[in-house]
């Protein structure tokens, strides 16, 4: 006869032991008669400033006025969009309608602050409803600029990629992270002006960052950003809150929706549940709490067009037609040679963007725009114009066959992660060590750094090329021994291209080597125009 192990007999008897009635201790007997101290509910409210969310009710609201009616003063608002593209103007106008007595002291987080009397957060800042902004760039908002410099509003300026990652981290429940962006800059030191008094004197600065070393490289610790309310514009939304975005409107929309305690989406089209294929959804409905119809028109910040007959599938601009080569054209022509077949490239505004015009048709490059495009094409014709497709300079552009669009966190992950082969930027100053200054001149209006600090954050993987005129407007050299302007990045530039010559930079040794000269230019002429010391390559050649 088989005998069961004692452990088995104990397990078999366990249910009976658990469910049998036994006398309770007196203290537990007292608790048994008291009402429970918990309850299940469909209502969710995490922050005192965040409106309550009732999961049992429909997400559809009659209009924007109803959807923003319970936003509290002092709330943090995450406002999606890039420039004027993808901005939730219907919701912003409804918030403005409530007025500064009902809705005030707001902290607003966005990439830009819009344009006065046109669109974006400018409606709220002009109305005195915003106390603090967290943005990467002021843009063309003169009224906000004046308000900032006279103490009317506090502005925390943050590198664009860092801003996007702080928001993404907030939505993912990650309190902080380390980034190579902005090491050795005013951002790291906590010296970016944030608050002025009425006389225009700086009375407040940004927060100093913690610096830590990983693998021999230094990184800054950045804290996550979350909001009480996110306001987002989407192209199509179903009644469950699933969203579909068009092109570059998704720059900040999806990540902000995930980082807020309550998300309101204004939709150009509201459709029944089941309309979308699951593969087509950009933002799942779990992140959306309220849906309203979008009634505000789309705005275009910088309308750029090309003529029908000059359409090109390999450039973002049209090359100059003059027979005389200007300084800018000479620089752009040489910069184009840095763009090799199959490369993924990011081009800054101005001369760097012009370089794309001189890439031969036989060379295929993929242009990346940090607001969320890979495969950017030329300016559109009037027929091709689409307000939802813009570049990092807020200009209207097109997409080439094979292009993709994505949010800003994805975009700057490509950049910081070293997946971009070449980044070409302009400069105010470049040092012999490859230090770059290109976003701020002390004493002049400071509009922000945008994405420049992110673009130079991984020079070991992404080649950073500076394309700039050799001399500044005041006649001083831009090629210096040491930068005296605030740095965008330290030891990050590998090649410098000017109208006079080309320098290769040894970032480790802090040395410049003259490798090419423009026709008709002498070494002595280059020395006279260059503050930094440099060596001359034994293989010095003509700049083509």
Model-derived regions: residue spans:
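N-terminal mitochondrial targeting presequence
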Residues: 1-56
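N-terminal glycine-/serine-/threonine-rich phosphate-binding loop
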Residues: 38-108, 307-344, 364-365
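Conserved phosphate- and dinucleotide-binding cores of soluble alpha/beta proteins
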Residues: 55-62, 68, 83-99, 115-125, ...
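Structural beta-sheet core signal
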Residues: 108-110, 265, 367, 466
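Catalytic or ion-translocation cores adjacent to nucleophile or general acid/base/metal-coordination motifs
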Residues: 109, 366-380
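Short, T/G/N/S-enriched strand-turn elements that build extracellular solenoid repeat scaffolds
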Residues: 122-123, 356-358
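Substrate-recognition/specificity elements adjacent to catalytic centers across diverse enzyme folds
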Residues: 350-353
């Amino acid at each position: 006869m088989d005998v069961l192990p004692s452990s088995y007999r104990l397990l078999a008897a366990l249910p009976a032991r658990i469910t049998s009635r036994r006398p309770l201790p007196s203290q537990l007997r007292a608790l048994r008669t008291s009402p429970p101290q918990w309850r299940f509910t469909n209502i969710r409210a995490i922050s005192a400033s965040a409106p309550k969310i009732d999961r049992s009710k429909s997400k559809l609201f009659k209009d924007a006025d109803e959807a923003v009616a319970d936003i509290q003063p002092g709330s943090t608002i995450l406002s999606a969009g890039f420039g004027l593209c993808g901005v939730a103007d219907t919701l912003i106008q409804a918030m403005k309608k409530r007025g500064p007595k009902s809705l005030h002291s707001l902290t607003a987080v966005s990439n830009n602050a819009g344009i006065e009397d046109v669109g974006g957060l400018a409606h709220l800042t002009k109305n005195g409803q915003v106390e603090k902004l967290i943005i990467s760039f002021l843009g063309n908002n003169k009224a906000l600029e004046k308000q900032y410099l006279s103490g009317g509003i506090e502005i925390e300026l943050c590198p664009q990629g860092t801003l996007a990652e702080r928001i993404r981290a907030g939505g993912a429940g990650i309190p902080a992270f380390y980034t190579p962006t902005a090491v050795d800059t005013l951002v790291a030191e906590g010296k970016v002006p944030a608050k002025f008094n009425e006389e225009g004197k700086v009375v407040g600065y940004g927060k100093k960052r913690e610096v830590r070393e990983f693998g021999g490289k230094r990184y800054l610790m950045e804290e996550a950003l979350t909001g009480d309310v996110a306001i987002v514009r989407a192209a199509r939304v179903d009644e469950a809150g699933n969203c579909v975005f068009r092109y570059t409107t998704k720059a900040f929309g999806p990540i902000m929706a995930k980082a807020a305690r309550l998300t309101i989406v204004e939709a150009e089209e509201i459709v029944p549940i089941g309309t979308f294929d699951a593969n087509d959804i950009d933002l799942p409905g779990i992140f959306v709490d309220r849906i309203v119809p979008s009634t505000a028109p789309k705005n275009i910040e910088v309308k750029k067009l090309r003529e029908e007959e000059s359409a090109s599938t390999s450039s973002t601009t049209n090359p100059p037609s003059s027979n005389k080569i200007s300084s800018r054209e000479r620089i752009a022509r040489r910069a184009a040679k840095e763009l090799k077949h199959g490369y993924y490239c990011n081009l800054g505004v101005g001369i760097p963007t012009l370089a794309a015009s001189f890439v031969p048709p036989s060379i295929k490059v993929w242009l990346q725009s940090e607001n969320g495009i890979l495969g950017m094409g030329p300016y559109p014709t009037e027929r091709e114009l689409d307000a939802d497709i813009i570049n990092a300079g807020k200009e209207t552009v097109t997409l080439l066959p094979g292009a993709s669009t994505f949010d800003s966190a994805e975009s700057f992950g490509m950049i910081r992660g070293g997946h971009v082969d070449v980044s070409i930027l302009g400069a105010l100053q470049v040092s012999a060590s490859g230090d770059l200054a290109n976003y701020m001149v002390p004493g002049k209006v400071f509009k922000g750094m945008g994405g420049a600090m992110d673009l130079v954050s991984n020079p070991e993987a992404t080649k950073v090329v500076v394309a700039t005129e050799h001399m500044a407007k005041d006649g001083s050299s831009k090629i210096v021994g040491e930068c005296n302007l605030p740095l965008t990045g330290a030891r990050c530039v590998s090649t410098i291209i000017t109208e006079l010559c080309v320098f290769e930079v040894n970032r480790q040794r802090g040395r410049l080597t003259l490798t090419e000269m423009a026709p008709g230019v002498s070494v002595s002429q280059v020395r006279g125009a260059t503050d930094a010391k440099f060596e001359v390559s034994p293989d010095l050649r003509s700049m083509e």
